[in-house]
């Protein structure tokens, strides 16, 4: 019997996606990354068919003995590389992690202070997202335009006046660290808790190029496991022994998660091991690449945000493209050339301009994992110039992009040869490999 046409279409689309994004494009979305072949090999397993409500060794289902083992191991590994005491891997995304924390810390009608939207606050921090869905009032802290950050002095005054239930730092357009250690004492002085959303920078934190918010006074840290930390899509929550963590961990199930997508756990554990051995070199190369790309774009006539601050300290670069037609137009134009970025609000944009903002947000973490370094950032900047400034034929630029990618198809910062792992692995892992 031949395949049904519908099945052929599913397989055709999946193959096309794999070929296009894995081999032909420059993937510069700041919230994406790629797992290693080893992590992918354990991602598809029997765990993906199973349920395990509750915590390890305290389940509501039978048949979870290996789930308990892998979840405990994964949490231990994540705590080790994070230098933290507590980890919960059950949130299925960073936004779910935020929701679980916010709900424990406040009731509907309570107030929360967040980093200004201009300083990169994620939508889940706002009335338009998770906070709004929970009925919690969001109040933006004052913005320091010069430093593209929270205005510390004015924020301290606001904390003292508002006395919020909690304060949120961290963001999605996130070029420079928010002032955790400067604000933490003042947050705690009014009886509030400090939440740090490290979704974008978690890989930089465990790679030791970005300060640990837990060591600077944050009570709890939420993360994504698939941005600068190159694991499977999911979320996690960390603390250094805070009571808040215990409360959140008790309520993740049943409030926000029933089954927590168990196939993530082996892949998260593998990625944590990779980052234990390669995370620092990976994070260092990410930040070198982002700065190199920012400088190369500026040299070619682009208005790169944050020039007075060195452009960036994270994996991200932000570019104002208003003079070329705006973020929406330029992001689509770049995609035609197989360069994948996203349009993004810039600090001086109004929220209502979200559909056609001034800027582009660029992330270098995925192409860094494919082995690109500073010289390739120069090449990428030149490709941007050809498309946007020189108005070259996008099909010709696309061919250049595809040719460039031919040299960067293997994931780095992992164990070089999966066959070499057989001498270290159990028989069961050999079967998977």
Swiss-Prot record:
Cofactor(s) recorded for this entry are:
pyridoxal 5'-phosphate
Keyword DNA-binding (UniProt): no
Taxonomy, superkingdom: Archaea
Protein source organism: Saccharolobus islandicus (strain M.16.4 / Kamchatka #3)
Q: What is this protein called?
A: Serine hydroxymethyltransferase
Q: What Gene Ontology biological process does one annotation of this record name?
A: tetrahydrofolate interconversion
Please list the residues that bind (6S)-5,6,7,8-tetrahydrofolate: 121-123, 243
Q: Which GO terms describe its cellular component?
A: cytoplasm
Query: What is said about its interaction partners and assembly?
Result: Homodimer.
Function according to Swiss-Prot or TrEMBL: Catalyzes the reversible interconversion of serine and glycine with a modified folate serving as the one-carbon carrier. Also exhibits a pteridine-independent aldolase activity toward beta-hydroxyamino acids, producing glycine and aldehydes, via a retro-aldol mechanism.
**PROSITE patterns of this UniProt entry?**
SHMT
Does the keyword Ribonucleoprotein feature in the UniProt annotation? no
**Pathway listed:** Amino-acid biosynthesis; glycine biosynthesis; glycine from L-serine: step 1/1
Positions marked as site (Plays an important role in substrate specificity) = 226
By sequence similarity, the record places it as follows:
Belongs to the SHMT family.
User: What HAMAP family has UniProt attached to this entry?
Assistant: SHMT
The top EC class is transferase
Keywords from UniProt, A to Z, are: Amino-acid biosynthesis, Cytoplasm, One-carbon metabolism, Pyridoxal phosphate, Transferase
Q: Annotated Gene Ontology MF terms?
A: glycine hydroxymethyltransferase activity; pyridoxal phosphate binding
A Pfam family that the UniProt record links to this protein: SHMT
Where does the record place it? Cytoplasm
Q: Give the sites modified to N6-(pyridoxal phosphate)lysine.
A: 227
Chief location category: cytoplasm
So what EC number does this one have? 2.1.2.-
């Amino acid at each position: 019997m031949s395949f049904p046409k519908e099945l052929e279409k599913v397989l055709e689309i999946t193959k096309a996606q794999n070929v296009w994004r894995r081999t032909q494009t420059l993937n510069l979305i700041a919230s994406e990354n790629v797992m290693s072949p080893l992590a992918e090999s354990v991602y598809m397993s029997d765990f993906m068919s199973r349920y395990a409500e509750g915590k390890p060794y305290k389940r509501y289902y039978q048949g979870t003995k290996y789930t308990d083992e892998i979840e405990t191991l994964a949490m231990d590994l994540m705590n080790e590389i994070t230098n933290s005491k507590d980890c919960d891997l059950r949130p299925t995304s960073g936004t779910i992690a935020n929701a679980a924390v916010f709900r424990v810390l406040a009731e509907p009608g309570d107030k929360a202070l967040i980093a200004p939207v201009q300083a990169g606050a994620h939508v889940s921090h706002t009335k338009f997202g998770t906070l709004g869905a929970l009925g919690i009032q969001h109040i933006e802290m004052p913005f320091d335009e010069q430093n593209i950050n929270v205005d510390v002095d004015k924020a301290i005054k606001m904390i003292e006046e508002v006395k919020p239930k909690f304060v949120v730092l961290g963001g999605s357009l996130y070029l420079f660290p928010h002032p955790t250690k400067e604000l933490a004492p003042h947050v705690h002085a009014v009886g509030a808790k400090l939440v740090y959303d490290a979704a974008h920078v978690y890989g930089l934190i465990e790679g030791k190029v970005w300060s640990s918010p837990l060591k600077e006074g944050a009570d709890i840290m939420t993360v994504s496991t698939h941005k600068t930390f190159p694991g499977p899509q999911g979320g996690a929550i960390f603390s250094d022994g805070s009571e808040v963590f215990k409360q959140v961990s008790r309520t993740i199930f049943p409030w926000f998660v029933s089954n927590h997508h168990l196939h993530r756990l082996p892949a998260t554990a593998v990625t944590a091991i990779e980052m234990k051995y390669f995370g620092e070199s990976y994070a260092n190369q990410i930040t070198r690449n982002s700065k190199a790309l920012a400088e190369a774009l500026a040299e070619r006539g682009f208005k790169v945000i944050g020039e007075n601050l060195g452009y960036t300290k994270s994996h991200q670069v932000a570019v104002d493209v208003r003079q070329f037609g705006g973020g929406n137009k330029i992001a689509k134009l770049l995609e035609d050339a197989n360069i994948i970025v996203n349009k993004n609000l810039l600090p001086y944009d109004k929220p209502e301009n979200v559909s056609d903002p001034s800027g582009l947000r660029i992330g270098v973490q995925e192409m860094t994992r494919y082995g690109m370094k500073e010289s390739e950032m120069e090449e990428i900047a030149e490709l941007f110039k050809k498309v946007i400034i020189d108005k070259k034929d996008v099909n010709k630029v696309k061919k250049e992009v595809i040719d460039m990618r031919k040299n960067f198809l293997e994931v780095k910062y992992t164990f070089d040869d999966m066959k070499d792992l057989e001498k270290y692995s159990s028989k069961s892992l050999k079967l998977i490999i």
